[in-house]
Amino acid sequence: MVAWQAAWYYENIDFSAMPFKMRELSQLIKITSFLSGKELRLKLTNYYGKEELIFDEIYVALTADMKEKQRVTALYQDTIVIPQGEAIWTDSIDLDIKVGQTIYVYMKSSQEQEYCDFKCTYETSLTNASFARSANFLPKLSDTWQSRKGWFCLEEVDVWTKATPKYLEVTGDSLMEMGMITAPLMQYLMTVHPDEVTVLNTAISGSRLIHDAPHDQPIYETFGESLLSRMVRNRSGFKPELTIVSIGANDLMLPLISEVAARQKNN
């Protein structure tokens, strides 16, 4: 049976403590599909912002230069609005997608806005991103691993497919979010088990196993809920067959630099 299935999933992080304030925005995101299919749709989130977000234009293409790009709409409107505290699905577009297909999403906004739903990677072979503070600009992607490659709002890409994949979750702290560990595994699964597995990345840099983020510094607040809390809440709604976790260093280190974390440990 043909159905919508997640072909790419990177769970957005709450950056409301350190929002990105932009007069204008353009961002280019490279994703790699775990599944083959004939149609595509995007999930865009604004869970953590204080106001609605407006994107004037969103496009999808198979090349980074965005030649032969297709316009993405939501409710058949070119201007896409993401209500505060919500997520939306775009309308589907026809696109012939193969396993391992590289897809580029180009999003533009001329509105002065704060972006709080954020995700990033350092390893760029399968997922990459770049953004600029101008609406009329196509950002260039960099392949260097020394700097963070971040993007806003895009959390999931689904394809209309006959495949019925199992889900593998990778989660924990920065080691899992950065992609150095997960990218080889993802590439292996695409090659050896095409159309059978989709990897879900729900890691958060700075995350701890037991305690939620301390609040004595804005950067600490971005570390989010404890992994135990997040796994119970399961915001993604997926039921992974297997979850791979790498976490623990921040449980040891944060109490050394944060008074709030030190009190949490003592309690």
Role assignments for model-derived ranges:
Residues 1-171, 176-178, 183, 191-194:
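N-terminal secretory targeting modules
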